[in-house]
Amino acid sequence: MGKPTSSGCDWRRFLRNHWLLLSTVAAVVLGIVLGVVVRGHSELSNLDKFYFAFPGEILMRMLKLVILPLIVSSMITGVAALDSNVSGKIGLRAVVYYFSTTVIAVILGIVLVVSIKPGVTQKVNDINRTGKTPEVSTMDAMLDLIRNMFPENLVQACFQQYKTKREEVKPVGDPGGNATEVSVTTAMTTMSENKTKEYKIVGLYSDGINVLGLIIFCLVFGLVIGKMGEKGQILVDFFNALSDATMKIVQIIMCYMPIGILFLIAGKIIEVEDWEIFRKLGLYMATVLSGLAIHSLIVLPLLYFIVVRKNPFRFALGMAQALLTALMISSSSATLPVTFRCAEEKNQVDKRITRFVLPVGATINMDGTALYEAVAAVFIAQLNGLDLSIGQIVTISITATAASIGAAGVPQAGLVTMVIVLSAVGLPAEDVTLIIAVDWLLDRFRTMVNVLGDAFGTGIVEKLSKKELEQMDVSSEVNIVNPFALEPTTLDNEDSDTKKSYVNGGFAVDKSDTISFTQTSQF
């Protein structure tokens, strides 16, 4: 009498282990209800709407705060933990996986939009335009991508990235012209109304972390200090401590997440002015969401099952908190701290894999974005009554794949790359304003698919790299400078005579490939 029942213990254990996920789901529901109630019973000014969403803004700021130290520390320690040959193999496998899934997503999107034909029953004039068209040149965008891979100032790369801007050169006689404004001038001509225009290239910097440049630098830096032996030990220890401290901060931020998400959702519902646009673009949205659902529920799990031979949906359930966060905040980079935590703690993916693969995936693996761009381009062509040739469809496929890889993991990046895709096949770039009104919603779902693709990638790459990781674990020639250096430990069970385990960072790894948390775990 008085003993708790097993079912009661199970419920308490379940609530204790999943309280954050459950509270986040509850926050989403309450946010929707609160947004609908406030929208229906009061008229808020733009200033009131801004103040209402303030708690959600704080959540976004906190998550973005830890992006920089997390990417830098995880990439450097992850690469330094691996032999250069092993890191090369892991990197190649990750890139092949990213490229393959992106191509599959593009093909899936084109097949769906060609089959469903969401734009055939509508015309351009039937849909209200929203916002303005981003001014983007395909050549400038590709060159900026390469420039940002090699930042000229590492400190500046932490808060700015390079972005080219074109300015029209006024004739010498024009008092408004100034042909000597910058030292580097590129003459470009366009024919418009029988007039030749010249443009000059103005180098500018826009706010935002240059994630790609930092990843390239951290990759090289990690390889170098990994080969420095004892001289590099102090740097390895520093970045390991930085990574652990950052994840501790992430745990604190997670406690505030339900409150922030509640006001993010409610604020967005209050902010939307024209709900009629969802009816007009309903078939287009259904096409995009169907493609994202097929890719995330069938394609990615099937790839995971074929390679890993484990239940993919159990793996996806372990990433539930990260997926829900991505759905709410619409940024794969800002979701990265939560993605790390779920992959390493819930799914117990080797930290040497997550630290190397996840930052790269959050930058270049954009399956959802690629699918969306392919669908949107064909949809706009259908609205204009244009029949795309096979060559144009192939061009859309290639451009959407390349543009999604170059897109940064930030909100609304799809619109910028969308202009590139439209320009590649001669479609009017200004028609991107037709879909801006619903982009905020679709952006959340495609971000969730991007994060899910990154997560499955860690599991697949870990399985494919199992042989190399085991060789590092049991190698007799262990590099003591390695941040995941192997130290022999003893097991407190009857198999201690037949098994030998090694401390791998915060994990105990034995030859039976069983992974469990030890008292040295930092999580």
From Swiss-Prot:
Source organism, top-level taxon: Eukaryota
Glycan attachment residues as annotated in the record: N128, N178, N194
Zinc as UniProt keyword: no
Free-text disruption phenotype from the record: No visible phenotype at birth. Mice are born at the expected Mendelian rate, are viable and fertile, and do not develop any neurological symptoms with increasing age. They show decreased spontaneous locomotor activity. Besides, urinary excretion of glutamate and aspartate are strongly increased, but glutamate and aspartate serum levels are normal.
Modified residue annotations for Phosphoserine: S516, S521
Location(s) in or outside the cell: Cell membrane; Apical cell membrane; Synapse, Synaptosome; Early endosome membrane
Membrane-spanning ranges: 19-38, 62-82, 94-114, 205-228, 238-265, 286-307, 353-379, 440-461
Any one Pfam family match given in the protein's UniProt record, by short name: SDF
Record InterPro entries: DAACS, Na-dicarboxylate_symporter, Na-dicarboxylate_symporter_CS, Na:dicarbo_symporter_sf
Annotated positions binding L-aspartate: S330, S332, T369, V410, R446, T447, N450
GO cellular component: apical plasma membrane; cell surface; cytoplasm; dendrite; early endosome membrane; late endosome membrane; membrane; membrane raft
Tissue: Detected on neurons in the brain cortex, dentate gyrus and hippocampus CA2 region (at protein level). Expressed in whole brain, brain cortex, hippocampus, cerebellum, lung, kidney, small intestine and skeletal muscle. Expressed in the renal outer medulla, medullary ray and cortex (at protein level).
Cytoplasmic topology ranges: 1-18, 83-93, 229-237, 308-312, 344-352, 462-523
Positions that bind Na(+) 2: T363, S404, I405, A407
Gene3D superfamilies to which the protein is assigned, alphabetical: Sodium:dicarboxylate symporter
PANTHER family recorded: EXCITATORY AMINO ACID TRANSPORTER 3, SODIUM/DICARBOXYLATE SYMPORTER-RELATED
Domain notes: Contains eight transmembrane regions plus two helical hairpins that dip into the membrane. These helical hairpin structures play an important role in the transport process. The first enters the membrane from the cytoplasmic side, the second one from the extracellular side. During the transport cycle, the regions involved in amino acid transport, and especially the helical hairpins, move vertically by about 15-18 Angstroms, alternating between exposure to the aqueous phase and reinsertion in the lipid bilayer. In contrast, the regions involved in trimerization do not move.
UniProt function note: Sodium-dependent, high-affinity amino acid transporter that mediates the uptake of L-glutamate and also L-aspartate and D-aspartate. Can also transport L-cysteine. Functions as a symporter that transports one amino acid molecule together with two or three Na(+) ions and one proton, in parallel with the counter-transport of one K(+) ion. Mediates Cl(-) flux that is not coupled to amino acid transport; this avoids the accumulation of negative charges due to aspartate and Na(+) symport. Plays an important role in L-glutamate and L-aspartate reabsorption in renal tubuli.
Subunit and interaction comment: Homotrimer. Interacts with ARL6IP5. Interacts with RTN2 (via N-terminus); the interaction promotes cell surface expression of SLC1A1. Interacts with SORCS2; this interaction is important for normal expression at the cell membrane.
Name this polypeptide is given: Excitatory amino acid transporter 3
Organism: Mus musculus (Mouse)
